């Protein structure tokens, strides 16, 4: 059997990860981080936590976990940039109504998707939270 190596280059290099155990203050710190200049609106990506749990339990290997996380983050960040999966629930922590740039986030559903979206945010050094 051939040893297949999984590798995924990330489109986005600037990522701020707010992590910690339950009740450690993540919900208080993450909105502060996402309010900073060039930082995108807060997203909670529970799949990433689940992938790391599987890796820690040795149910998947480290190489697979890294590949899956990179792939999922790129997909999630791109979808955020084109306005896909926007949270419009007013009272939710990740709602666009709690963002510093609500109108800009809402208008993303109107932009044309494609590689130019990624290029723009790489050049602007956007930080994803």
Task: Give the role of each language-model region.
Residues 1-9:
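Pre-Walker A adenine-sensing motif
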Residues 8, 31, 118-121:
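A general structural signal for short secondary-structure junctions and capping/turn motifs
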Residues 9-10, 35:
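An N-terminal structural lobe/cap that precedes and organizes the functional/catalytic core
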Residues 12-15, 125-126:
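Pre-Walker A (Motif I) flank of P-loop NTPase domains
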Residues 18:
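Hydrophobic anchor at the beta1->P-loop junction of P-loop NTPases
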Residues 24-41:
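A conserved segment at the C-terminal end of the G1
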Residues 45-128:
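PAPS-dependent sulfation machinery
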